[in-house]
Curated annotation (Swiss-Prot):
This is tRNA (guanine-N(1)-)-methyltransferase. The keyword Disulfide bond does not apply. Its EC number is 2.1.1.228. The gene is trmD. GO terms for cellular component: cytosol.
Length: 255
């Protein structure tokens, strides 16, 4: 996968290119990242990249000409088929379904805004899609872009050590992940659930699915509203609710 970055601070993306899973993907040639700074397309000695908004108000906007020229340079490098994305609070909220959808693209160009944003006409003429990582304000689009790159790159074949990892992640099936345990078997009196030590793969799968359903019900119940549960999932969720109620009753009795 090829990803182009439009940013005033391209150095920030070393967090993606030099470290962790994405760093290995870049090193192994599975992910290619190039960046363009609008500052490199300015024509004044101050390398100005901001301008006042019409109508007044606080803050500045990114200057149109350097930004457009940077986008055009990225498009030229990408060739045909690159989707241009602007990271914006007004965009579609990124979720696992959206990540999976974006991962089907071989080429992406991510435009990172700064200041109060970018000219609406640039959005209309240069941007294919707007995406947001949440309903809150950040200083720029770099962190959302890195979030998008990290999540999308997990779907690139060969990036993860285990090919099933991406499909078993939290939200991969619309559910939160189940609890995980490693050594020691007993930690300050807290034991690993016996089923995970049993070697019975069918029971382990069943336990993990039940815990995943239960954790989603407890922490993000709205996610279940959009799911059509199978008979097995509905049965396991009912079991979890019963067990949870019993544990709560026992806990209340001891309090």
């Amino acid at each position: 996968m090829w990803i182009g970055i439009i940013s005033l601070f391209p150095e920030m993306f070393r967090a993606i290119t030099d470290y962790g899973v994405t760093g290995r993907a870049v090193k192994n040639g599975l992910l290619s990242i190039q960046s363009w700074s609008p500052r490199d397309f300015t024509h004044d000695r101050h390398r100005t990249v901001d301008d006042r908004p019409y109508g007044g108000g606080p803050g500045m906007l990114m200057m149109v000409q350097p930004l457009r020229d940077a986008i055009h340079a990225a498009k030229a490098a990408a060739g045909e088929g690159a989707k241009v994305i602007y990271l914006s609070p007004q965009g579609r909220k990124l979720d696992q379904a959206g990540v999976s959808e974006l991962a089907t693209n071989q080429k992406l160009i991510l435009v990172c805004g700064r200041y109060e944003g970018i000219d609406e006409r640039v959005i209309q003429t240069e941007i294919d899609e707007e995406w947001s990582i949440g309903d809150y304000v950040l200083s720029g689009g770099e962190l959302p872009a890195m979030t998008l790159i990290d999540s999308v790159s997990r779907f690139i074949p060969g990036v993860l050590g285990h090919e099933a990892s991406a499909t078993e992640d939290s939200f991969a099936e619309g559910l939160l992940d189940c609890p995980h345990y490693t050594r020691p078997e007993v930690l300050e009196g807290m034991e690993v659930p016996p089923v995970l030590l049993s070697g019975n793969h069918a029971e382990i799968r069943r336990w993990r699915l039940k815990q995943s359903l239960g954790r989603t019900w407890l922490r993000r119940p709205e996610l279940l509203e959009n799911l059509a549960l199978t008979e097995e999932q509905a049965r396991l969720l009912a079991e979890f609710k019963t067990e949870h109620a019993q544990q709560q009753h026992k806990h209340d009795g001891m309090a």
